[in-house]
Amino acid sequence: MAIHTVIAEQSWYNDYNFMEVIQMNKNESAENYLETILILSKSLPVVRSVDIANELGYKKSSVSVAMKNLREKGHIIVDKSGFITLTQTGREIAEMIYERHELLSSWLIRLGVSKDVALEDACKMEHVISKESFDAIKKAIL
């Protein structure tokens, strides 16, 4: 059975445009990589693909493909030594995602959600929550 047939039979497919779902997953992946680079840059003198692979538990080859895509989009710079730095736009995206993650996870923990579940849920929420909703939550809890 073709993948498109299987997907079309899924109930969620009728509610979402399949290509939008694919694009959303690509954006989420890119945002996770940018956030990871930001976090690693706070504790390491330089960030390399191998550092990202170790942090995320991914194969170095997968990280290399992602770094190529982020570089092509202008979110990172990779120098001749393989050191990765965020561009201004890459840093802005990473800081936005990081702020969302930190605020949402701490909020969920204060609501009584276990730390593990709060961290996992915040990681999902940080990519899909609207600016309006995030700002409202931020205003309410700060």
State where each predicted segment sits.
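C-terminal regulatory/oligomerization modules of transcriptional regulators
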Residues: 3-16, 44, 120-142
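Basic amphipathic alpha-helical segments that dock to polyanions
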Residues: 33, 52, 63-73
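Residues within the alpha-helical elements of helix-turn-helix
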Residues: 55, 93, 110
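Key DNA-contact positions within bacterial/archaeal DNA-binding proteins
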Residues: 61, 116
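A short, conserved structural fragment
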Residues: 73-79
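Basic, amphipathic "hinge/linker" alpha-helix immediately C-terminal to the N-terminal HTH DNA-binding motif
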Residues: 82-100
